[in-house]
């Protein structure tokens, strides 16, 4: 990423990459609706205003205050008498939510800033990852060692997953051919994205040479992260009460979302 590029151009590129990522998003329909609303009118002026605010070091307190959580049922425990009978007529209150899907509700302007942060600093962090780290890897140009131009930021996850799995099977077959014993363990870290804690010092600009726009993007990105994690912390604190409330709600089962802004 050209650090000397005009901030207006960088914002447009970040917005384009954000839109491209949402094209493949199948779960977070709320975010897709946010993008539709954002693009409904005066989109060019909105991007210009965002670039000017970043360049001038303006406050984003109003947007930061709007950060919250968006909850959907992930796993439902049914108490129906006969699980082999499928019907569209049953009592919602006889079902219990066992697990939740938790999404962050963040204004589109801040999503653009987050993408801009990845564009400016992501390649430096990606270099530090082991070659066997497969998820959420950036598309890096081998010659420039920077993020490639284009609409996309990350390598498609399903392709990375297939490659990881195929290599594991190939290695297992190789060991078997050499008369070695093989045991394949497939482990999954439960609630990883809800549990991981990142220290600000782990996300430093490795160059240590910051221009004003980079400083603004960096500081704002930290605030986005901190405000989002604060919402998660509050949710964890009240989870017992929340589960009780969810058990009493039937509307959340229907095709509507239930946003919670903390």
Positions of predicted regions on the chain:
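Non-catalytic, polymerase-adjacent accessory regions of viral genome-replication enzymes
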Residues: 1-93, 97
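Generic detection of long, well-ordered alpha-helical segments
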Residues: 33-44, 107, 111-114, 151, ...
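Hydrophobic, Leu/Ile/Phe/Ala-enriched alpha-helical segments that form helix-helix packing faces
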Residues: 42-58, 120-121, 125, 172, ...
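Short, flexible loop/turn elements at secondary-structure junctions
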Residues: 74-76, 108-110, 188-193
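Short linear interaction motifs
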Residues: 81, 85, 89-102, 162-176
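Conserved pre-motif C helix in the palm subdomain of viral-like polymerases
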Residues: 97-133, 240-262
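Active-site-proximal segment of RNA-dependent polymerases
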Residues: 118-186, 191-197
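Conserved polymerase palm-domain catalytic core
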Residues: 170-262
